[in-house]
Amino acid sequence: MTVLKMTDLDLQGKRVLIREDLNVPVKDGVVTSDARILASLPTIKLALEKGAAVMVCSHLGRPTEGEFSAENSLKPVADYLSRALGREVPLVADYLGGVEVKAGDIVLFENVRFNKGEKKNADELAQQYAALCDVFVMDAFGTAHRAEGSTHGVAKFAKVAAAGPLLAAELDALGKALGNPAKPMAAIVAGSKVSTKLDVLNSLSQICDQLIVGGGIANTFLAAAGHPVGKSLYEPDLLDTARAIAAKVSVPLPVDVVVAKEFAESAAATVKLIADVADDDMILDIGPQTAAQFAELLKSSRTILWNGPVGVFEFDQFGNGTKVLAQAIADSAAFSIAGGGDTLAAIDKYGVAQQISYISTGGGAFLEFVEGKVLPAVEVLEARAKA
């Protein structure tokens, strides 16, 4: 994968537009999870150190395109960046006609989705973005799977289009985990539905030695193997699909589970052997025996890919399975890569971020890369590098 890298460019005195993924949760005007902002800081600092006039852009939330909405404003992000960088980071709302930024200074552009044509990747808007800069830097892996004005279109028209350090590191890490993984390789794929992760499961079944499933996905595999799942979430129409995947790769199934009679924070948790699951039980986590077995599998792996918590870890009584596996990944000597929104929240909760080799900032983009799909924003950078 050959792309031009920001780290190789002379940015002194250049106007540099950096597309970051600053789509963070905000409550009452305050950023509540800063992982994506923290991930973007090294790129922003490097551009400033290189003497660039830095312009940063991102989307936040899902506003009606072309309309301002206060709840989707990047103002809280500008405030956060100002504190993190120890200097004022002005939020500029009206920038498409041109902006004055001095070398060594930084501004944050207001939400790109307030611009008409952003999501449709309109050439006219992309050309306006491109006219703002000498160098466009795509650093938002989390939106690389979307061909939008600020992720794809601008890269077609900018004088120079390069990958930022965060995007480049992401591509390198994913290439290492998926291109030529050290064996044995284990993957954890969890989520509510097989249907939403079918391509991921199929893709990983071709390169993995162990495919550990969790959540509603595991329930479908359990039902496919003839085990009772009570009133748990599962997909009866995908039992044959689950069997076909299990025929291609080792899919270890839970021997015990944690069940409840209702899905609620106050629900009483009971550990049961899988054969003892009653008709009115909901499976909300893997049991301690299963967690220990899966942890042993991870211990002997040399590559681990983790996407999704294996239980409803937001409720502590259904979090032990995810906690044990998170710790097993942290303790492992394997090259480990983790991605997907809920996965990041679990990593935060159990404090294992420092012990995971690479944490992907992309949710949908991470999954599409794992599926083997071409990411439009990366494809255009490759095309520009060849040209």
From Swiss-Prot:
Recorded GO CC terms: cytosol
Gene3D superfamilies the record matches: Phosphoglycerate kinase, N-terminal domain
GO molecular function: ADP binding; ATP binding; phosphoglycerate kinase activity
Location in or out of the cell: Cytoplasm
EC numbers, comma separated: 2.7.2.3
Pathway recorded for this protein: Carbohydrate degradation; glycolysis; pyruvate from D-glyceraldehyde 3-phosphate: step 2/5
Ranges in a coiled coil: none
Binding positions (substrate): 21-23, 36, 59-62, 113, 146
Example GO biological process: gluconeogenesis
UniProt keyword terms in alphabetical order: ATP-binding, Cytoplasm, Glycolysis, Kinase, Nucleotide-binding, Transferase
Pfam families: PGK
Catalytic activity annotation: (2R)-3-phosphoglycerate + ATP = (2R)-3-phospho-glyceroyl phosphate + ADP
Residues annotated as binding ATP: 197, 314, 340-343
EC class: transferase
InterPro entries reported for this sequence: Phosphoglycerate_kinase, Phosphoglycerate_kinase_CS, Phosphoglycerate_kinase_N, Phosphoglycerate_kinase_sf
HAMAP family to which the protein is assigned, alphabetical: Phosphoglyc_kinase (MF_00145)
Subunit structure of this chain's protein: Monomer.
Family: Belongs to the phosphoglycerate kinase family.
Protein name: Phosphoglycerate kinase
Annotated organism of origin: Pseudomonas fluorescens (strain ATCC BAA-477 / NRRL B-23932 / Pf-5)
Upper taxonomic lineage: Bacteria, Pseudomonadati, Pseudomonadota, Gammaproteobacteria, Pseudomonadales
